[in-house]
Amino acid sequence: MKKLILTAAARALTAGPASAQTVRLGTEGAYPPYNFINDKGEVDGFERELGDELCKRAGLTCEWVTNEWDSIIPNLTSGNYDAIIAGMSITAERDEVIDFTQDYYPPTASAFVGQKADADITGGTVAAQVSTIQAAHVASTGATLAEYATPDETIAAVRNGEADAVLADRDFLAPIVAESNGELVFVGEPVPLGGGVGMGFRESDKDLKQKFDDGITAMKGDGSLNALLAKWFTESPVAY
């Protein structure tokens, strides 16, 4: 069941005009440090803080909705929530179905991780999360693609030997490698994929998209977006 979580920004705004717009923000809740569920059962992470701040700046009441990754776009277009903020890379294929804001996380490379540095990433089995740009890339390389529903399952597949390596965003993998005590290592060269990470909206919601786009522009301009990036991505820092 999808989980609705009233944000702090929403609570602060409930005393406002009754006409204030309530916006439902859809995320996966399983892709740290972008988004995850904390010990209190609440959405947390970089995108939680970013989304709350964007809602505050736009004067919007916002709720958080968690949704499995492989249906996150269909459930946006069907109206289950109003925006996606879930570590989603901007791609031409996705842009044919939904509209993206500008990126709030700059284009960065994906990476392979395995149990040894010479893991076979061209002829072996490579794990990737289903419906991701990484899965599409693996399918195009000649390696055997093993798709999993969640990011954690892709890591588990490498640890238990089901896959020779995993391909995912480097910033997701970096803390996992650092905390593995040498069990996991980066393999080969980084792989540039996607056009950065942006928020996704229904194509009919152009005015709503613009409110968030304006907020992202303002946060880039005043340095607050860079401050959030520095806070949450300590293993692979990026900035605008």
Which residues make up each language-model segment?
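Extracytoplasmic small-molecule ligand-binding "clamshell" domains
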Residues: 21-87
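Periplasmic-binding protein-like
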Residues: 106-111, 174, 178-217, 235-240
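A conserved helix-loop-strand patch within extracytoplasmic ligand-binding domains
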Residues: 60, 89, 94-96, 100-146
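Gram-negative bacterial Sec-dependent N-terminal signal peptides
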Residues: 1-20
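Ligand-binding clefts/hinges and TM-proximal coupling segments of bilobed small-molecule sensing domains
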Residues: 61, 137-153, 186, 216-240
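A ligand-binding cleft/hinge motif common to bilobed small-molecule-binding domains
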Residues: 71, 88-97, 164-193
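Extended ligand-binding regions for polar small-molecule ligands
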Residues: 49-57, 116, 124-125, 129-134, ...
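Short helix-initiation/N-cap motifs at beta->coil->alpha
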Residues: 48, 64-74, 130-131, 146-160, ...
